[in-house]
């Protein structure tokens, strides 16, 4: 396993978060000075207050790790950036350390691909957790029983009118947003990750509000797919250039049907189950809980904090954090803090994925199997104190982290945010989470309120759903404006050197002749110190990622490979099977309390499931037809390349990229070297496509070294995923034997 060399701990800048609005700032929150947690300040924590913008130099630490899977802790070589600050000053509360500091800027790495759980999976986890606590006799959150006051007839009529009013408003706004996004897709524009998530939720809402749309929209879409491909050729990449018109038609039909089936399955997983016995208590409990935290100042119970903290998932939290909060988290995790908001979120997302995978691997081996240096590396990667503490303290805080993340299922983003606030160590984990939730924006609370209703199977409040949709749409529009401003600034920088403006002269004045500057030899100062310059890496832009995608598509066409389509179809079948198994497990869990008859799948979900199963059969037929035609020789030959061979040489990849569009030779060479991880001169096309799809979802520019890290990470993720699948298979076999 690769050893880890943390060359220096100097200058790890603690984070600065903005104070939360409209409520009192608790101790340890970003509004107040934070206590240092470095080793040299262990005895000064109660008497020296230092703001977040500085830190104390500490001794370098050299760490190593054992086992191949811990290699994801390996950090890339640092480049120190000097940030000029004001000198040390004294204030009424003590000394404020504001001086020059060295900020280590590192590249990021990621771990196993974490797919978001569907609403059904979240409901299943919630049910299993409740039943497990009931069996073990542990604490289960149970809201106090309240006397239900029967509403008057007029109040019930008014509430029903409001419900339908907000429902029709939601239907109209969802239709407008869906039509706009669909038009963008038809015209060849790609949706960002945030836009795709919004589009997915809107489609799920439309089918929930009007279940009959499944009979109208889905068959209509399938029928018009060939027409849409003809009218809007930009829907698919322009790489379907084959010698056989039949092959071109079949492959286009296969690609579009596969994407549509995957989208419909994602829509099914976004739909919630219906619980007829639900009384809307979960939504009300969450509103009361958040009101206690934000307004009244009343402390919720530990069960409430742990229960509702699970709703603030990493994606939801990171997408709605402000820029100062994103910068603070990047500094805490020693990531690059300069760049667009999308780039910062992308870095944080990849780092959180890495931490999630590491947590599972550490828990499998056991914290006691790690030595001191490995413990320091693990704690430092999670924003916890790593120096100046005992070995028992390191093991204790790492065990507490694993318990909160893996057993209590607290999202990693909340745990990292609590470390960024540098709260006192005497606070309990529940109090730390409470202080962290106070700093989250209001939009996160709206999204979580809708999520808790979906997980519990309650009727979603149309007003809350409407507010969450409008806030998310406003955030998407703000991202578009930021991208437009960034493009304009880049264009302005390109034209700036060409502008030469002459200095104006006063009328009637004669130009003065230029006099040579004479400087005495004794006054000339020479700096003999060598100039230190960081290594400049080749940056890959979004446009070049698209070029690389086109090149891969051409190579796949030349090799007549359907490996990608087959793999995606198998994943789709697994998703359908997992969804069906989750429904069966939910009924099994509910049978323990006799409530299985009250929970059922929505009508739209049932109809979409049948349609997806039909489309899977059609896709299987298309793939079989293409393979039979290739074997019979009816389609074009594979240009001398063996069919199904997906490994190409680096030279082939460079030539393919040259044919698509001109890119500098140096960048092509460095990019190809980054993709060739084991340096054998060969690259797997399918693995390359996975990397491109991962980066293409985000509108960010990355370096070639970061591309290499993604390639290595994806291979590591596959190994971890295989271990988990093998473990699940073994558990199922044991359960079948017992039954």
UniProtKB/Swiss-Prot annotation:
N6-acetyllysine: residues carrying this PTM: 597
Post-translational modification summary for this protein: PINK1-mediated phosphorylation at Thr-192, positively regulates its mitochondrial calcium transport activity.
Transmembrane segments: 209-229
Pfam families linked to this entry: LETM1_RBD
InterPro entries: EF-hand-dom_pair, EF_Hand_1_Ca_BS, EF_hand_dom, LETM1-like_RBD, LETM1/MDM38-like
Mitochondrial matrix topology ranges: 230-739
Residue ranges, annotated region (Disordered): 718-739
Signal peptide: none
Cellular localisation: Mitochondrion inner membrane
Top-level taxon: Eukaryota
Result for mutant: residue 305 to L: No effect on mitochondrial potassium ion transmembrane transport; it fully rescues defective proton/potassium exchange in letm1-deficient yeast
Residue numbers bearing the Phosphothreonine modification: 192
MF (Gene Ontology): calcium ion binding; calcium:proton antiporter activity; ribosome binding
PROSITE patterns per record: EF_HAND_1, EF_HAND_2, LETM1_RBD
Family classification: Belongs to the LETM1 family.
Record note on quaternary structure: Homohexamer. Can form 2 complexes: a major (300 kDa) and a minor complex (500-600 kDa). Interacts with BCS1L. Interacts with GHITM.
Summary of the function given for this chain in its UniProt record: Plays an important role in maintenance of mitochondrial morphology and in mediating either calcium or potassium/proton antiport. Mediates proton-dependent calcium efflux from mitochondrion. Also functions as an electroneutral mitochondrial proton/potassium exchanger. Crucial for the maintenance of mitochondrial tubular networks and for the assembly of the supercomplexes of the respiratory chain. Required for the maintenance of the tubular shape and cristae organization.
Protein name stated in the entry: Mitochondrial proton/calcium exchanger protein
Source organism of the structure: Homo sapiens
